[in-house]
Amino acid sequence: MVAFMSQTDTLLTELIKRADQLLEVLGKQQQGTGIEPPDWAASVAFRYRRFRNGRAALVPVSHVATMRLDDLKEIDDQKEKIQRNTAHFMAGLPANNVLLTGARGTGKSSLIKACLNTYSGDGLRLIEVDKSDLIDLPDLIDTVAGRPERFIVYCDDLSFDDGEPAYKALKSILDGTVSAAGANVLIYEIGRAHV
């Protein structure tokens, strides 16, 4: 006896096969944070990117600024404070998240880049995040949890409107809620004084 598959049976079999493939992909995404980790050896600095297709990744920065702390002039007090805080963080001692404020061109971003260059040989890494992506901060922190490196999550030009979701995500991390930053993560932000 010869069995024949109708066109409907063939289409149904193909549909089931595709549904199984989709479920497998979705299952893999659910297992992790949904953020593709980078080749950690590729750089000391990374950019968090959320792509239009919903995929997210940490993208290595090819050309990291070579700013050094000694290059920064006339900001000795700020330089000493951020260097001490970063040194404590690197030593596993208590350290604070940082909000730098001030006029444009006063060295705020340069301080953070110089700290990265000072401590990258000891395992410090920087992850730059756009303000609009701060809503993904808990997933980002989960991605680096358990890594031997120490991470500064950095956001430039931080300002929020009332009730903005990114503000709520950042505030929950800073306030130490259930999704608190791990021992290997500090947040260094640049923004307005009232944030």
Show where each model-derived region lies.
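Pre-Walker A adenine-sensing motif
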Residues: D77-A91
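Interdomain "pre-motor" coupling segment immediately N-terminal to P-loop NTPase/helicase cores
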Residues: F4-P60
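Conserved catalytic/switch belt of AAA+ P-loop NTPases
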Residues: D142-G146, D162-H194
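AAA+/P-loop NTPase substrate/partner-engagement loops
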Residues: T118-F151, D157-G163
